[in-house]
């Protein structure tokens, strides 16, 4: 049996180069340099090209986009209702150390989401070591419990789905590459695991020689693997990366940053043009020795290209950055300069980003539900664990909302209810949880005291323009009910000569 690259799935072969490009675009640094994504000039030798790769900076937008998505998705962790799994001895250890590497289940799922955004999808296997323990408690003492492992797409070589009589697609074959070890310059050692519904095979490969080293029964009766896409595609087993467009635009920016670097370097350091027999250098204060009989037309001179194109290249880079923001619906989030969007345009941008994040949360929720079904199957429990990811995300422009509320308050609308609700909205922008609930109670209590005009009060008798104030005029203007006889009027105080200038 052959287990090398010749037996990979056709879609694996179609997407392998793209996966490498996406992960290099996300990683940046030396990984991106090694990808050699700069266009080589005509007659450019290997050393000059390597130097240009080393001098060209890389502005990593892909990593920024992926982590902004992740920060929004995991700002509020998912809620889980375990039902019959409550009290299971393996539940708490699994939640605290899901992959037997010290990471909690939330941290593991967040990492899966990040790498799914990069590659387009990842696979998660939930396995359980073989055990001879008689009870679940003995298994826990031996650390025999379910655990999860993530496989990135380049390590899942082949897969197959089959349609069941009910019409549902079921994973019936999966081949994963578990480890690759470079023994020496000519020898590579690789371990593969092949899953089917009834057996599990472990294969060991050294270069082109493959050998099956272990066969076990699949006691679960199904392949314990879950496919987690970043975005669904029309091809089963292949997801769409969040970087599918942004990575190519980032590469175009990388090309133009190389042009910027060369324009600056060459325009600041002109090239000395001289005849072969002239003794000269281009350094500051250098002395040029010319033959006495040299033709005047052959005098040395400096060749300096124009740097006028620099602004055009920089403007092109800015346009591409704006394109990346539009592709990822990040125009209102990633903008570093003053945003000139209208309120409606910005709200639309937030809504589009919120819809994208909500779709991602639904995919994660579905994947986690499948993982908990596998957990319950391994532990012999009823698979009734419920998972709830946030359906909407707090994407708000706090400055604009606060300004709007302040303007609304200053309009002078005669409504105590409206004033209370405005105060509550302002509190919502600043506080949360218990502090917010307490603030709402205080606002309502304060409004009931300040807005209580059931008893008579005193009002001034005259307007500022000397017009007479009627007894119930103030109540009518602020929307309160009239009282019998109206409010009492304050009698004007007669001024004396000693009151002049006193305030």
Give residue spans per PLM region.
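Extended, helix-rich architectural segments
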Residues: 1-151
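Extended, regular secondary-structure scaffolds
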Residues: 113-117, 121-233
């Amino acid at each position: 049996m052959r287990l090398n690259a010749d037996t990979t799935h056709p879609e694996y072969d179609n997407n392998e180069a793209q996966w490498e490009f996406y992960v290099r675009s996300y990683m940046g640094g030396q990984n991106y340099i090694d990808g050699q994504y700069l266009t080589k000039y005509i007659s450019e030798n290997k050393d000059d090209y390597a130097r240009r790769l080393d001098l060209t900076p890389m502005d990593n937008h892909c990593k920024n986009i992926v982590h902004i998505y992740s920060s929004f998705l995991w700002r509020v962790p998912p809620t889980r209702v375990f039902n019959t799994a409550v009290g299971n001895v393996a539940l708490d250890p699994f939640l605290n150390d899901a992959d037997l590497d010290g990471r909690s289940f939330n941290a593991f799922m967040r990492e899966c989401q990040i790498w799914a955004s990069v590659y387009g999808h990842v696979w998660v296997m939930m396995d359980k070591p073989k055990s001879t323990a008689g009870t679940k408690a003995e298994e826990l003492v031996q650390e025999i419990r379910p655990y999860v492992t993530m496989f990135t797409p380049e390590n899942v070589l082949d897969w197959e789905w089959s349609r069941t009589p009910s019409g549902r697609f079921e994973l019936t074959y999966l081949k994963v590459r578990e480890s690759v070890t470079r023994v020496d310059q000519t020898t590579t050692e690789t371990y593969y695991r092949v899953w089917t519904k009834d057996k599990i095979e472990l294969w060991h490969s050294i270069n082109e020689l493959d050998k099956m080293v272990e066969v076990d029964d699949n006691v679960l009766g199904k392949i314990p693997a879950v496919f987690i896409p970043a975005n669904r595609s029309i091809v089963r087993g292949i997801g769409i990366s969040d970087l599918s467009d942004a990575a190519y635009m980032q590469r175009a920016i990388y090309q133009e940053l190389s042009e910027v670097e060369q324009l600056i370097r060459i325009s600041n350091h002109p090239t000395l043009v001289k005849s072969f027999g002239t003794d000269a250098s281009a350094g500051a204060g250098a002395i040029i020795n010319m033959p006495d009989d040299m033709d005047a037309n052959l005098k040395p001179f400096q060749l300096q290209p124009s740097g006028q194109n620099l602004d055009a290249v920089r403007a092109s880079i800015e346009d591409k950055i704006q394109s990346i923001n539009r592709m990822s619906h990040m125009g209102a989030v990633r903008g570093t300069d003053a945003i000139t969007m209208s309120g409606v345009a910005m709200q639309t941008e937030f809504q589009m980003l919120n819809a994208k994040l909500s779709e991602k949360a639904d995919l994660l929720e579905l994947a986690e539900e499948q993982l908990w079904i596998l957990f319950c199957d391994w532990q012999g429990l009823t698979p009734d664990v419920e998972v709830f990811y946030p359906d909407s995300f707090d994407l708000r422009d706090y400055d604009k909302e606060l300004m709007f509320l302040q303007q609304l308050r200053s309009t002078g609308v005669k409504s105590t209810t409206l004033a209370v609700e405005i105060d509550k909205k302002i509190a919502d922008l600043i506080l949360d949880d218990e502090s917010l609930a307490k603030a709402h109670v205080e606002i309502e209590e304060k409004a009931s005291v300040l807005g209580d005009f059931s008893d008579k009060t005193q009002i001034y008798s005259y307007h500022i323009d000397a017009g007479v104030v009627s007894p119930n005029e103030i109540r009518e203007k602020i929307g309160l009910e009239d009282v019998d006889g109206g409010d009492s009027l304050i009698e004007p105080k007669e001024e004396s000569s000693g009151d002049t200038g006193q305030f």
